[in-house]
Structures are given as structure tokens and as C-alpha cells.
């Protein structure tokens, strides 16, 4: 019985993933139940979030290691990008811009450090291990948007 439940669950996960693949707009890449797109144009974090919202999405949030790895696959090597994390409301209480719970992290060693008291937005860093860093929201970087399939 447990094997049957496992197979049914596996089928449901894959069917949802294929459903997303069928309805992501051209240029957007499916992953599980969302569509993602990397934008190389360098803008500040607030502008990146507004640009994603204008496309019916938000900056990408990350809920598990596999999703983090997927996002890295969208970004050229040695490229820093914005994703949707911020602690602009209460210092060191990180939130996702889409409102989802913050349950997974991939911070670089000694991060977040709020360097000079002005780092409140989350970037994927260009370091060897492509970990997360808090950065000044006014820094201009490319970004990754996420949205539900249309």
C-alpha cells in the first residue's frame, strides 16, 4: 500500500510539472508549478520586483535546494542576480516578496552581515559556491522572475 501511495504521489508531482511546462509563456522555463525567467538588465531590487509584478509575478523565492539549483542553471556563470528575499521591514527577519514562508536558506559564510547597515535585499552571489548574500537594494543587478503558469 505504501508503494502505491508513493507511486501516486510521484505521478501527481510529475503531472503538475508537465502541466506547468505546457502553459509557460515562450521564454519562461517551468519548474514544478511555476515559470521562471532570467532578465540580464541591471536594475535595483525595487525596480526588479516591480518589473516582475508587471508580468504577473514576483522576484523568485526559493523553498528548497533543488529550486535553488534550478535558478542557478538559468544564470550565466559569474553573474550576480536579485531574487525575492528582503529584510526591509525588520532587520534580519527575511521575507519573500511573494509572501511565501522563508523555510530554506543558502547564505554564504558569514552572511547575512548587513554591511554598513544598508544591506536589506538578497542576491545570488558570483562566488564559487553561488551562495546568497545580503546586498544594498540600490545595487543594480540582473534578476529572476517567477510566476504561475497562465
Residue spans for each PLM region:
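Extracellular, disulfide-bonded carbohydrate-recognition/adhesion ectodomains
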Residues: 1-150
Amino acid at each position: 500500500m505504501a508503494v502505491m501511495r508513493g507511486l501516486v504521489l510521484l505521478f501527481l508531482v510529475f503531472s503538475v510539472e508537465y502541466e506547468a511546462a505546457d502553459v509557460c509563456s515562450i521564454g519562461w522555463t517551468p519548474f514544478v508549478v511555476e515559470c521562471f525567467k532570467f532578465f540580464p538588465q541591471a536594475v535595483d531590487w525595487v525596480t526588479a520586483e516591480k518589473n516582475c509584478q508587471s508580468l504577473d509575478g514576483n522576484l523568485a523565492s526559493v523553498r528548497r535546494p533543488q529550486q535553488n539549483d534550478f535558478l542557478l542553471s538559468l544564470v550565466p556563470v559569474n553573474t550576480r542576480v536579485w531574487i525575492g528575499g528582503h529584510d526591509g521591514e525588520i532587520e534580519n527577519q527575511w521575507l519573500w516578496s511573494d509572501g511565501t514562508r522563508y523555510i530554506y536558506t543558502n547564505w554564504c559564510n558569514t552572511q547575512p552581515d548587513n554591511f554598513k547597515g544598508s544591506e536589506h535585499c538578497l542576491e545570488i552571489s558570483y562566488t564559487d559556491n553561488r551562495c546568497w548574500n545580503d546586498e544594498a537594494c540600490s545595487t543594480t543587478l540582473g534578476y529572476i522572475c517567477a510566476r504561475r503558469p497562465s
